[in-house]
Amino acid sequence: MGMKPKMLVLINSSTGLYDFRNELLSELSKSYCIVVSTPDSGKIDLIKKLGCEVIITPIDRRGINPVVDLKLINNYRKIINKEKPDYILTYTIKPNIYGGFLARVKKINYAVNITGLGTTFQKDGLLQSIVTKMYRVAFKKANVVFFENIENKNIIVNKKIVPDSKCCVLNGAGVNLDRYSYLEYPVDCKTTRFLFIGRVMQEKGFDELYTAMQRLVDGGFDCKLDVLGSYEEDYKKKIDSAVEAGWLSYYGYRNDVRPFIEKSHCFVLPSWHEGMANTNLECASSGRPVITSNIHGCKEAVLDGTTGYLCESQNIDSLYECMKKFITLSYQKRKDMGKAGRKHMENFFDKRIIVDSTIKNLK
């Protein structure tokens, strides 16, 4: 048997790659020797266990310092020259731009993944026009550009970054229905436990959630909020005071969120923008109702009124009304919502279907 072709995967977080795409890596490693370049060591041991080689490459994820980025391009160039990959697969903005550009220049087959357009495309401005131009250059010769929702694809096509024929929209990374198996709904009790999983930051809608919770508690509704995820420093005071008031429990980042999903009644993610919110999928797959924003990347996961509720993004009143509506539901109705959510995941978000579809489109 001849040598397997080599695939280079460029990403900005080993944790994100492993948590959401380990099944894809396993499947790809049957046909390719895989080398992963990542800036962090978070989950590299687990990635190596899948049979991949790992190279640590520093990336300033949010900075826009050209000197730092030139260093990244140079590091990528060295890796490509040394590894001589047959295919390059990139995720997230900097790997997409610089990896895509180098693959194009070196005439290597490549595919890019738009896992969300972030704040850059929320408002017109200099940064948006620079990124648009960079995307155009970097994606020009891509074999395929993957998207996690239709709106992101339409933005990229309308800006004439890539033609529609090169685009492939997947339902995010999908959800592993076995790992996130149906969990029995918690026994009927008078306190409603809401759950938030994600980075505690403005763009995840945490401020709206905090205010809505406070309003519910002040209004005499018996509810609590469990928060999982790291927080940005300016939220410390807020979290501490809610913990002290007794309506919020903070657990930090957790590798395994399933025990927290199990004891929750409802998951809430009032995000401002998402590629495809994995946490919505995981909680729905586990049989929990979901309240989330009525935006692309969130709303696909919910059948409004059947598996949860959709609220307006960046709108405290709308979120408050949805949460209040949920609190007043009967135990049976909540349980039925959770079951319907599980069914919706089985029908449209099964990770196996998404992995197969990704591989089929890489050709």
Predicted regions and their residues:
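Donor nucleotide-sugar binding/catalytic pocket of nucleotide-sugar-dependent glycosyltransferases
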Residues: 55-56, 136, 140-182
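Conserved acidic donor-binding segment of nucleotide-sugar-dependent glycosyltransferases
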Residues: 304-305, 309-316, 325-331
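Short hydrophobic beta-strand element within catalytic cores of glycosyltransferases
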Residues: 289-292, 302
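Acidic anion/phosphate-binding donor-loop and adjacent secondary structure
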Residues: 64-68, 157-158, 172-191, 259
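A short, well-ordered alpha-helix in the C-terminal region of glycosyltransferases
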Residues: 318, 325, 332-347, 357-360
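A conserved mid-protein helix/loop that constitutes part of the nucleotide-sugar donor-binding site
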Residues: 18-23, 192, 196-215, 317
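Short, structured helix-loop element that forms part of the nucleotide-activated donor/catalytic region
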Residues: 44-50, 215, 219, 224-247, ...
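Aromatic "clamp/platform" in nucleotide-sugar-dependent glycosyltransferases that forms part
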Residues: 253, 272
